[in-house]
Amino acid sequence: MKDNRRGFLKKGTSLAAALSLGAVGASAATNNTNTAMAPAQKVAWPVVEGADTPKMTMNVGYNDMSSKVRAIKQFGADYVHMDAPALPWTVEKIQAIVDRFKAEGLSIINHRIVLPPSILHNMAGRDEDIKNVQDAIRITGKVGIPVIEYNFYSHRLREGYYNSVGRGNARYLSFDYNRKMPNPADNNWNEPHDRKADEMAFAASELKATAAEPATSEEQFWENITYFLKAIIPVAEQSNVKMALHPNDPPPPLSRGSAQPMGSFAGWKKLLAIVDSPANGMTFDCGVSTEIGENAIEVLHYMAARNRINHMHFRNVKVETPRIKYTETYPDAGQVNMFAVMQELVRAKYKYGVFAEHPPGNIIDKERGGDFIGYIYNQAYARGVLQSVLTLEQGYKG
């Protein structure tokens, strides 16, 4: 496997050089000895994106204005995903959203639901709320949306995030489980945090649970998610809908006292085994896979071989200490081989969404507001990688 992967990387490098130079051939070097110019190669163009290839998607709000929606289409995305309206739904309500985007040439490939505390913590009303999720799955299938994404955690440790400086003074988002934050305004960016004033002297690792987000033990987590999955996955199978659980991000060992089983590869494997079905899948995030100290390609292999990747987040990181300290970077500036990730997706015939998320902050977005330019950069980068991989697979003979 290592030899095959090394060979692929050499071919990928040759292809990238050929495409960037507009060349039809490339010179090669073996054992530090120059060889003759290789014969001209025919590159199939345009590349074919179809039913069995990854689909670039961008995030929207279901009420977004048509100008933003059209800009997304102009920049090369044919698919979108979004936070879904609060449950419960009607078919008519969700169909109207689907039709609105369809009129702009965009298909909804995934929508995210927020699970209520009753499901996460086994509180009163759990079965009624699970019924609402089951109904939402049926409606999702009826309107033709293939994937529902969801989280299953008591608390997301945003308090460990802070902003660091990247290339050209870009704003990178960093995480440090042990970092103390005495002042929320310790830099010029709007630092994400949700600390109370009396918590500022503590590290994120020292924060305690709150009444609104009670601590959950690992045993309680597995009991609650097992109950949930056994209730909803059969409905998803019947409705031709795939469920995609997003792993813990950030993935520290504890988050305000709550266990974080979805912050480890072992936990992901255990999740997929609860109900052995392609409908019981995950959002594969090559960034999170690296944050927890795993090889993103190996994680991808494991999940793809079992047909459990139902959504994909395409981003890069630099990790100092797995699960504890890392920085999110531009996609071309981290430690993950993004070309290799995309090639493995293509070879696995992955056919759902690829979202190039978490763009670093840039000066244009800072001056104009929002983060649209950052997302367009990430989208263009990922689209270029996808087209390079598809060209390699479909027509380039290096």
What are these language model-derived features?
Residues 2-53, 119-122, 138-146, 159, ...:
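Histidine-acidic metal/acid-base catalytic patches
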Residues 58-62, 84, 110-113, 150-152, ...:
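A cross-domain feature marking catalytic cores of carbohydrate-active enzymes
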Residues 71-78, 95-102, 276, 301-305:
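Short, surface-exposed basic-aromatic patches at helix termini and helix-loop junctions that form
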Residues 83-223, 238, 288, 346, ...:
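Structural motif corresponding to the early beta-alpha repeats
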Residues 64-83, 143:
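Catalytic domains of carbohydrate-active enzymes, especially glycoside hydrolases
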Residues 61-72, 129-137, 295-301:
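Short, acidic/polar
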